[in-house]
């Protein structure tokens, strides 16, 4: 059942990505427009998704589940970072960054909510927050090879962290937002999947097919990101008692997502190989339509 839902949802995402590609090729979506959409996603859509996920009744069971999801997220990232460093080290910063950091925000959250319902975003939000923290610390060191480039302000003052703090405050205090605000946030949050996939479609339109399909190293990066890391993460979750059940599956779905769009953003920001980063994002996203369903099929036998 989970595999079928996941396969359906990833296929929907693929169609949306093709829509973005068509809009770009016909001139209806420009580079400037794609950047604006990315900003809307980062500064409006994702915060609404995270805050809404915490608008639920406080219980000790949910609090325990939230803490466990954070612990499992740390374990998943430990696997991803270790594997990426062993394979790429500091020689290939884009490949290291891209395989270590997944697309938990734009792909993981909608997939988790499609499989387990909107309340499941409550647990995957902690995964996305830890991802954000690691990208702005360890990720910066990978990309720039310089520790002094870490911006402490951006580590803590960013849309994901701020929305997490607001969400936790609402969850712990039990404060309910007015219906009109809640409905507005729900409408904005619903843009997450369509907007993110359309932006990815724009990225795909900028890549030459030859560069995308005839580079063996890109296939290796996709294999590491989509097969090796998720399967090792599954093994770790199988060993850890808390890794079994719904929270373990949520963690694995997030950890099995393709190369994060942040790889292209960071590459452009810090003067690295932007075109390669875009190719990694696009190729791994295309392959993830199949690989995520396979990984989840195995996970149902191991940790559910």
Walk through the language-model features, giving the residues of each.
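Alpha-helical transmembrane segments of multi-pass small-molecule/ion transporters
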Residues: 1-304
